[in-house]
UniProtKB/Swiss-Prot annotation:
The gene coding this protein: tal
Family in the record: Belongs to the transaldolase family. Type 3B subfamily.
UniProt organism field: Cytophaga hutchinsonii (strain ATCC 33406 / DSM 1761 / CIP 103989 / NBRC 15051 / NCIMB 9469 / D465)
Protein's name in the database: Probable transaldolase
Origin superkingdom: Bacteria
CDD domains the UniProt entry points to: Transaldolase_FSA
Length: 218
């Protein structure tokens, strides 16, 4: 399973990259705004800065919601760096644009996916990634993890090459459950990735080893 970090914060991206397990980055307009990045030139420079840090794919989201606008924005975004993946919303014109991009060899991430039917359309259109949102489904008392399992199963049935990129991952159990059902990628905040490091028995065991070492060696 690939690990992507869901942030536009350069320090967090560097920290995840330094762990040696980072496979990519996902961003969105909200994350850019959180970092105070505004204006097309600044946004593009920030994407380039992200690409300079990581070795893997960087999802950059279009703002347009019409077919022509999505195409224009996507074709601009890919000029930033070969690592850029165009993030396209799950809407009618988005699906049409994903098909266009697929035919042109431009990689895409279909975002805001909340049903297996939407994921099926994205795969049929040739999306590189599809991003189902686990946490947001959980927020409305629907089972986000069940959706991930459904999509993984459907894609395996038909040998679709679209990768299931689980998004809106809120905690480590979300991440572990995604691994259990076979998600190809998980994108999450830095604290979820680093949360995998922690276990009280690891801490107590290490403390005992160090204490015993001190007793023996003074």
């Amino acid at each position: 399973m690939k690990f992507f970090i869901d942030t536009a914060n350069l320090n967090e991206i560097r920290e995840a990259q330094e762990l040696g397990i980072l496979d990519g980055v996902t961003t969105n307009p909200s994350l850019m705004a959180k970092e105070g990045i505004s204006g097309k030139d600044n946004v593009f420079k920030h994407y380039k800065a992200i690409c300079d840090i990581v070795d893997g794919d960087v999802s950059a989201e279009v703002i347009a919601t019409d077919y022509k606008g999505i195409i224009e924005e996507g074709e601009e975004l890919i000029t930033i760096d070969p690592k850029i993946v165009v993030k396209v919303p799950m809407i009618k014109d988005g699906i049409k644009a994903i098909k266009y991009f697929s035919q042109k060899g431009i990689r895409t991430n279909c975002t805001l996916v909340f049903s297996a039917g939407q994921a099926l359309l994205a795969a049929k259109a040739g999306a590189t990634y599809v991003s189902p949102f686990i946490g947001r489904l959980d927020d409305i008392s629907q089972d986000g993890m069940e959706l991930i399992a459904q999509i993984v199963g459907i894609y395996r049935n038909y040998d679709y090459q679209t990768e299931v990129l689980a998004a809106s991952v809120r905690h480590t159990m979300h991440l572990i459950n995604c691994a259990e059902v076979g998600a190809d990628v998980v994108t999450c905040p830095l604290n979820v990735i680093t949360g995998l490091l922690n276990h009280p028995l690891t801490d107590s065991g290490l403390a005992k080893f160090l204490a015993d070492h001190k007793k023996v060696n003074g």
